[in-house]
Amino acid sequence: MTKLERQVTICNKLGLHARAATKLAILASEFDAEITIVQGEKKASAASVLGLLMLETGMGKTITLLGKGQDADAALDAICALVDAKFDEAS
């Protein structure tokens, strides 16, 4: 099974805070794929809100998305779009 990788920069003011992490985890869970988020030396499942919060990812940080599974490409596209849309937050 091919592993896919993408990088995206967190651009919303509050970074990957609780509400944003929840949106990301819900989105990741919709796909038949295992998605891992990496920031520096830390890794977390994209489906784990607590794991995502433990990454302590702030505005301007670049994260790496690793995906494997049947829907990995679509999942990475959707997650990148969510991050680029600043998690649909006003600011």
From Swiss-Prot:
<protein>
    <recommendedName>
        <fullName>Phosphocarrier protein NPr</fullName>
    </recommendedName>
</protein>
<dbReference type="GO" id="GO:0009401">
    <property type="term" value="P:phosphoenolpyruvate-dependent sugar phosphotransferase system"/>
</dbReference>
<keyword id="KW-0598">Phosphotransferase system</keyword>
<feature type="active site" description="Pros-phosphohistidine intermediate">
    <location>
        <position position="17"/>
    </location>
</feature>
<feature type="domain" description="HPr">
    <location>
        <begin position="3"/>
        <end position="90"/>
    </location>
</feature>
<dbReference type="InterPro" id="IPR050399">
    <property type="entry name" value="HPr"/>
</dbReference>
<comment type="function">
    <text>Component of the phosphoenolpyruvate-dependent nitrogen-metabolic phosphotransferase system (nitrogen-metabolic PTS), that seems to be involved in regulating nitrogen metabolism. The phosphoryl group from phosphoenolpyruvate (PEP) is transferred to the phosphoryl carrier protein NPr by enzyme I-Ntr. Phospho-NPr then transfers it to EIIA-Ntr. Could function in the transcriptional regulation of sigma-54 dependent operons in conjunction with the NPr (PtsO) and EIIA-Ntr (PtsN) proteins.</text>
</comment>
<dbReference type="InterPro" id="IPR000032">
    <property type="entry name" value="HPr-like"/>
</dbReference>
<dbReference type="InterPro" id="IPR035895">
    <property type="entry name" value="HPr-like_sf"/>
</dbReference>
<dbReference type="Pfam" id="PF00381">
    <property type="entry name" value="PTS-HPr"/>
</dbReference>
<dbReference type="InterPro" id="IPR001020">
    <property type="entry name" value="PTS_HPr_His_P_site"/>
</dbReference>
<keyword id="KW-0963">Cytoplasm</keyword>
<comment type="similarity">
    <text>Belongs to the HPr family.</text>
</comment>
<dbReference type="GO" id="GO:0005737">
    <property type="term" value="C:cytoplasm"/>
</dbReference>
